[in-house]
């Protein structure tokens, strides 16, 4: 992990109140798809007081010539100044961090489960898979409140047509007073995952979403009893204490507590959205 000087190249709205930010890729910066960075806004950054650091998953694939993050924009002391910053504004990047890389077992399927802006690490992975043209089974279950809030929706639909073996399962769970939607509206649960992954060869599972989604998913995995014991944690927030496996798998920056639920390590947040990653074969019988 290194520290790099960079600058903002530009930004764009990719969904309602959701922006992608593009940064100059520093010389020598290398990362694995699914990893994240810590983005520091310098002391002279316009509009920023003391809130200068956030962790973000990288959206771009390693072969791309710029670094991209995406985030929901709220009126915070960090995000609002970032949204209003002009191209060319200097920033500092520390990273890469995190271990959400794909397993090196091409005979096993990949199941990704994303809630909202949790799609970001999977965009990096899918773009990399498409560039490498690796024909292995990949299923992405992607949940949002409404279509207009779904980041990278059009790109994901295009990837489904382009990437051999990739299947996209979309669900919009709050369709009142929204755009018309004829697709799935259930929350992602064990039954939906079973339906989407039926017949896949010994899949590995990756989950990225908010605390309530993490809690929903850990219970059925624990009940299945066949989840491999490797869980990784990534958290874009402030420092806290971790211990045991969680500390060994990730730098200790988080505002949540690690608990045990049904014998599986789960996470239950207090503020900020979080990413929780589980790797295993919960419904495959492996």
At which residue positions do the language-model features occur?
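Conserved S-adenosyl-L-methionine
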Residues: 107, 131-138
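Conserved beta-strand elements of the Class I
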Residues: 110-113, 206
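Short, conserved phosphate/pyrophosphate- and ester-handling motifs at nucleotide-, phospho-/glycolipid
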Residues: 34, 118, 210
